[in-house]
Amino acid sequence: MKNIAIIGAGMTGLSLAYNLQEHNITIFDKSWRPGGRVSTRKHDNYLFDHGAHYLSTNHSVNQLNEVISRYNLGQIIEIDFAIDFLKNKKTRKKIIIGQNGMNSIPKSIFDNIKVKSYLNSKIIKISKNSNELFSLFSEKEEFKDFDYILICIPYLQSKELSKELIDFTQIVSEPSYDPIHTVMLSYKDINNINVKAGLNLHKDISFFMNQNIKFNELSHDCWVLNMSSEYTKNNIDIDKPELEKYAQSIFEETFDIKNEISFIKSHRWLYAQTKVSYNSISKKNWINSKDNKIFLSGDWVLGKSLSDAWDAGEKFSHYIKILSI
């Protein structure tokens, strides 16, 4: 049995923890809760899935389906979906959502695997000790005696944390991300919008989704808008009020909304979704140190979806099992 530290409690980190439960696992995350970008925001009586919006029913990661079924984490709903709103292409679409928001999926997995964890703990340094074991350091604490360190955070953050321990000259081409501004907005009265989610609402808004179809307790009309990655990159440091006003104006003009807005807030995801995956440029499923003790993984290995993140962890876990025999 090995002592294994997992840095990052997103879907890849949770997948690793789930698949390596025969070892002594400790999970670290800078956030106060697990899930990473599978995030549900609560503001007063408003609820928004402002990270991952849903899980496709067509994904091919069998173990993730098994976990969702085993712990009763999701439900399938069918909604009116715009395949391309600007071209008026619409369909009925089945999607998987969390039982209580998308974050309830990783949170329930985390609660069920019952591993040792340190949330609200940002790891800022990794060092190798004289006994060939590793220590992790947050700003306040040291965590000792780990056999393996599995880093499951966005690639650039992983690289910065492990640059003294991994030879990154071996990486000829690096994975990349697209940033996305997300806008959450709510109206006191329900708007009569006949499509519940979709793509290409506007040249600057790549995705939109109603939240009332996920949270039955919502009395106000709540929506999440994703600005396009191109718009976000061109306006990466835009003032939030300016961004929110712009997104609101597009949304209201598109759907001829006359109701008064009751809430609006934006969030910038610098590492919103994988643009170029590591596997697509290297044919590899992780990055490792020469001594096979420090590893990097994440959704950026395989793709941009929630299922890609889980799949990256599951694939990687098989190698760790072989190493630790």
Question: How does the language model describe each region?
Answer:
Residues M1-T12:
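Beta1/beta-strand and adjacent pyrophosphate-binding region of the FAD-binding site
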Residues E252-N292:
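Flavin (FAD/FMN) cofactor-binding core of flavoprotein oxidoreductases
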Residues L119-F134:
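A conserved short coil-to-beta-strand element within the FAD-binding core of flavoproteins
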Residues G35-G36, F146-K196, I257:
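Central helical "cap/lid" subdomain
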